[in-house]
Amino acid sequence: MNILLIGYGAMNQRVARLAEDKGHEIVGVIDRTSKASTPYSQYQHISECKEADVAIDFSNPELLFPLLEEQFNLPLVIATTGEKETLIQKLETLSQRTPVFFSANMSYGVHALTKILETAVPLLQDFDIELTEAHHNKKVDAPSGTLVKLYDVIKELRDNVSPVYDRHEKTEKRTHDEIGIHAVRGGTIVGEHDILFAGTDETITISHKAQSKDIFANGAIGAAEKLIHKNPGFYTFNNL
């Protein structure tokens, strides 16, 4: 499989290493901001890389969005987070002519976490819910795309909920329809997501802790391996 990388930061550098270990070839890179040197051919536009079978994106909206407006038919694996609603709209339009895979978190374990959450929320309707994520001190967006995804799952299963991002200005008790959303940044934390269900005299916590960023890179490579055999459409872990 020949791979074009969109972005050449820490994540796609891992993708390159792990993909080559699996026998795949990196045939080019699109990156206008990275200070890292690359041994691969560099391109400005997706359509310029004729050898690629698929593109894997770990970048940012500033780099990705203009590329999505171009004319090409290359399958895309998208891991960019931020500006989610706009991103999804663009990807759904693009998926009418080419296969597109998107996940806010490329870990299959996080996908399993969302499935567990779908089961837990209806069972624990009387419990308050708080969501917490923790990442390294270089992550610039907050809350994480994964935490937003977890909130979206809850919103579909519990009526009239609303997110609460900051409590220090509130001088009133918590309401049941609040979903607390908290972000922690520090050190080299790869990624941690905790769902707290707090009831009367008991709590339940569901957690996922990433121990290496390799899980995200391997998830993207695995998605690409399947996506290149798919018809045009919008794919997630649910239908890939």
Swiss-Prot record:
What is the E.C. number? Answer: 1.17.1.8
PROSITE patterns, A to Z: DAPB
* Residues annotated as binding (S)-2,3,4,5-tetrahydrodipicolinate: 136, 145-146
Record pathway: Amino-acid biosynthesis; L-lysine biosynthesis via DAP pathway; (S)-tetrahydrodipicolinate from L-aspartate: step 4/4
Could you tell me the keywords of this UniProt record?
Amino-acid biosynthesis, Cytoplasm, Diaminopimelate biosynthesis, Lysine biosynthesis, NAD, NADP, Oxidoreductase
Q: What class of enzyme is it?
A: oxidoreductase
State the compartments where it is located.
Cytoplasm
As for family, the record states: Belongs to the DapB family.
The positions annotated for binding NAD(+) are 79-81, 103-106
Matching Gene3D superfamilies: Dihydrodipicolinate Reductase, domain 2, NAD(P)-binding Rossmann-like Domain
Q: Name one GO cellular component term.
A: cytosol
The name this protein carries in UniProt is: 4-hydroxy-tetrahydrodipicolinate reductase
Mention one GO biological process in which this protein takes part, according to its record.
diaminopimelate biosynthetic process
User: What reaction does this enzyme carry out catalytically?
Assistant: (S)-2,3,4,5-tetrahydrodipicolinate + NAD(+) + H2O = (2S,4S)-4-hydroxy-2,3,4,5-tetrahydrodipicolinate + NADH + H(+); (S)-2,3,4,5-tetrahydrodipicolinate + NADP(+) + H2O = (2S,4S)-4-hydroxy-2,3,4,5-tetrahydrodipicolinate + NADPH + H(+)
Q: Which GO terms describe its molecular function?
A: 4-hydroxy-tetrahydrodipicolinate reductase; NAD binding; NADP binding; oxidoreductase activity, acting on CH or CH2 groups, NAD or NADP as acceptor
Do the record's keywords include Oxidoreductase?
yes
Please give the Pfam families that the UniProt record associates with this protein. Answer: DapB_C, DapB_N
Gene source species: Staphylococcus epidermidis (strain ATCC 12228 / FDA PCI 1200)
In terms of HAMAP family, this protein maps to: DapB
Tell me which InterPro entries the record gives.
Answer: DapB_C, DapB_N, DapB_N_CS, DHDPR_bac, NAD(P)-bd_dom_sf
Biological role stated in the UniProt entry: Catalyzes the conversion of 4-hydroxy-tetrahydrodipicolinate (HTPA) to tetrahydrodipicolinate.
The record places the active site at 135, 139
